[in-house]
Amino acid sequence: MLLRFFIILFFLPTFFAYSQTQHGYIGTSACGMCHKTEKQGNQLSIWQGSKHSQAYLTLQTEKADQIAKEKGFQTKAVETPECLKCHASGYNVDASLLGEKFKIEDGVQCETCHGAGADYKSKKVMESREESVKNGLKVYEKTEDLCISCHNAESPTYVDFKLEEYWAKIKHMVPENKN
C-alpha cells in the first residue's frame, strides 16, 4: 500500500504537466502546406476566400474602433482582448508558443477552430485521429458549439446566425476517398 502511494506521488507531477501542455501555433501557411490540394480538400483556398481570413484586418478599421468605443473600451479594437478573442488566433498565448510562420493578421485561421498544431502537424500523427487529439487537435461533437462561441448575441455586430447556410460556404472537410 505504501509503495503504491509513493509511485502515485512520484508520477503525479508528470501527469499534471502532461495534462496542462500548451501546444504551439504554426500558422495558416504551415497548415496549408498539406491542406491546399484538391485531393486533400482545398482547405487553404476555402479559408482564403472566407471572411474568417479577414477577421483581424476588420479590427484595424475606423468602424471597428468606433464600435469598441461605443462598447466602453478605451483601446483601439485591434488592441482590445474582447475583440481579439473572436477575430484572431493566438492573441492571448505566450509569444514562445507562436511559430515562425504564425501571423496574427491571418485572423480566424486553422488553429482557431482546430487547435494549435505544432504537436499534431506531422503526417504520422495526423494519420491517427486519436494521436492528433492527444497532441492538440480539437474535435467538436457539434460544429455549432464552436461557431456560437463568437457568433452570438454578445457580439456587437451580431446578426441572425444561420449555421447551415454559413457552414455551407466554409465547410472544408477532408474527402473520404483521397485516391
Give short role names for the model-derived ranges.
Residues 10-19:
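Hydrophobic h-region of N-terminal signal peptides that target proteins for export
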Residues 18-106, 111, 117-141, 161-179:
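Sequence context of c-type cytochrome heme-c attachment sites
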Residues 143-150:
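Alpha-helical multi-pass transmembrane bundles of energy-transducing inner-membrane proteins
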